[in-house]
Curated annotation (Swiss-Prot):
<dbReference type="GO" id="GO:0070181">
    <property type="term" value="F:small ribosomal subunit rRNA binding"/>
</dbReference>
<feature type="compositionally biased region" description="Basic and acidic residues">
    <location>
        <begin position="117"/>
        <end position="130"/>
    </location>
</feature>
<dbReference type="Pfam" id="PF01250">
    <property type="entry name" value="Ribosomal_S6"/>
</dbReference>
<comment type="similarity">
    <text>Belongs to the bacterial ribosomal protein bS6 family.</text>
</comment>
<keyword id="KW-0699">rRNA-binding</keyword>
<dbReference type="GO" id="GO:0003735">
    <property type="term" value="F:structural constituent of ribosome"/>
</dbReference>
<comment type="function">
    <text>Binds together with bS18 to 16S ribosomal RNA.</text>
</comment>
<dbReference type="InterPro" id="IPR035980">
    <property type="entry name" value="Ribosomal_bS6_sf"/>
</dbReference>
<dbReference type="InterPro" id="IPR000529">
    <property type="entry name" value="Ribosomal_bS6"/>
</dbReference>
<dbReference type="GO" id="GO:0006412">
    <property type="term" value="P:translation"/>
</dbReference>
<dbReference type="InterPro" id="IPR014717">
    <property type="entry name" value="Transl_elong_EF1B/ribsomal_bS6"/>
</dbReference>
<dbReference type="GO" id="GO:0022627">
    <property type="term" value="C:cytosolic small ribosomal subunit"/>
</dbReference>
<feature type="region of interest" description="Disordered">
    <location>
        <begin position="117"/>
        <end position="136"/>
    </location>
</feature>
<keyword id="KW-0694">RNA-binding</keyword>
<keyword id="KW-0687">Ribonucleoprotein</keyword>
<dbReference type="InterPro" id="IPR020814">
    <property type="entry name" value="Ribosomal_S6_plastid/chlpt"/>
</dbReference>
<protein>
    <recommendedName>
        <fullName>Small ribosomal subunit protein bS6</fullName>
    </recommendedName>
</protein>
Length: 136
């Protein structure tokens, strides 16, 4: 069996419990086709770089999968049909990462954004304050 990293984006207007239900549905599909689901990272609700089907935010979920190609094809087929899934991508990898993904490591334990993003937001606020202080 091959190793895959699979990420999907779910609509912003569904409940977090529905995201977990989608995840368990796709896990059962993978296991029914003889595959195994490894690490699962739920990155939560995050902003999108651009609007996708009128959504500005989405729930991001990353899954490590050890499964045959038929299982991946079936999961992708079902995601294509499901209206709650905005985008998905599957990448074949040589080995799964042991530590957290780069995106997940930027989140702290409470689910807050990382320091780099916080710094950029504070500098943006300072620039906006300076602009507002200028009289025309």
């Amino acid at each position: 069996m091959a190793l895959y990293e699979h990420i999907f984006l779910a609509r912003q207007d569904i409940a977090p419990q529905q995201v977990d239900e989608l995840l368990s549905l796709y896990k059962s599909v993978i296991e029914a086709h003889g595959g195994k689901v490894g690490r699962v990272e739920n990155w939560g609700l995050r902003p999108l770089a651009y609007r996708i089907r009128k959504n500005r935010k989405a729930y991001y979920v990353l899954i490590n999968i050890d499964a045959p190609a038929t299982a991946i094809a079936e999961v992708e087929r079902q995601m294509h049909i499901n209206e709650d899934i905005l985008r998905y991508m599957t990448v074949r990898v040589e080995k799964h990462e042991k530590e957290k993904s780069a995106m997940f490591s930027r989140l702290d334990r409470n689910g807050h954004i990382g320091l780099d993003e916080e710094r950029s937001r504070s500098s943006r606020r300072q620039r906006e304050d300076v602009i507002e202080g200028v009289e025309l």
